[in-house]
Regions:
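Extreme N-terminal starter segment of soluble prokaryotic enzymes
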Residues: 1-4
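Short His-centered aromatic/hydrophobic patch
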Residues: 112-115
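Proline-aspartate-enriched helix->loop->beta-strand connector
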Residues: 101, 105-107
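Conserved N-terminal ligand/cofactor-binding loop architecture of enzyme catalytic domains
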Residues: 20-100
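Donor-nucleotide binding loops and adjacent catalytic segments primarily
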Residues: 192-193, 201-244
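Active-site-proximal region of nucleotide-activated glycan assembly enzymes
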Residues: 126-188
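A short, glycine/small-residue-rich beta-strand->loop->alpha-helix junction that serves as a flexible
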Residues: 7-19, 218
Length: 244
């Protein structure tokens, strides 16, 4: 059985979830039967730029505008109006991704991004490929963009995500609450004092971890300053990904 794991590099979360699934699968099946790809590598340059770069720009610099369109397009009536043109745009810009899937003909496609759901489901509806399509939803709250006819199973973060999907019209029998995929490395127990020593931390101080995702999205610097101004003894570890 051949497995294809697909993500889109619009932020780092979709990629990390896909990599976690990849790591877990490699513990169970032969390496030659598992492939992992970034679907945006199989699109045209302009589409990739919009998806991967402008997304981060909007979230960081124009969060109110981003939020407005996010919630607007999550209204059932509005989404129904844009569903077909959205599908056309995805299909037209993802021809090379379609070709990759048809050439490799996986038995199972596991997607951590809704764009891949749309493309693979389109191939299934047109009887171009016969495979299982599993969607690992990387958001805690559901958006209509994740809802695609042709997805066989949804693996979701929490019970609330499951309820959201059911509210979107998905059968409860297709939804499994598994949590967001994380690397098997996080299941390994480590000695806290050894880790603090490795990073040059004071073993006697309370330690807080601030995570801004793979691209340092959000007011991370402001948050650090405000916590640093508190009259308490603590030390901070800050993960800001590629944001230098």
């Amino acid at each position: 059985m051949k497995y294809l794991i697909v993500y889109a590099s619009a932020g780092a979360g979709h990629r990390k979830a896909a990599e976690a699934i990849h790591e877990a699968l490699l513990e169970r099946v032969d390496k030659k039967d598992v492939a992992i790809i970034d679907s945006l590598d199989y699109t045209n340059a302009f589409f990739r730029w919009i998806y991967a770069r402008k997304y981060i720009t909007f979230v960081n610099d124009l969060p109110n505008i981003w939020g407005f369109f996010y919630y607007l397009l999550n209204i059932r009536l509005i989404y129904r109006l844009i569903r077909f043109p959205r599908r056309v745009v995805n299909v037209l810009n993802c021809r090379r991704f379609e070709d990759f899937v048809l050439k490799n003909r996986p038995d199972v496609v596991i997607s951590t991004h809704f764009m891949a759901n749309e493309i693979v489901a389109h191939l299934k509806r047109n009887n171009k490929i016969n495979c299982r399509l599993y969607s690992a939803v990387t958001d805690y709250r559901m958006h209509f963009f994740w809802v695609t006819l042709g997805v066989d199973c949804y693996f979701v973060a929490a019970e609330q995500t499951r309820k959201d999907l059911i509210g979107c019209g998905i059968s409860k029998d297709k939804i499994f609450v598994t949590g967001i995929p994380i690397s098997p490395k996080f299941s390994v127990s480590l000695n806290k004092q050894d880790v603090k020593s490795k990073f040059g931390l004071d073993a006697s101080l309370f330690t807080a971890l601030i995570i801004g995702g793979g691209f340092g999205v959000g007011p991370v610097e402001e948050l650090v300053k405000k916590i640093g101004a508190l009259k308490i003894d603590l030390q901070l570890l800050v993960v800001c990904g590629y944001n230098e």
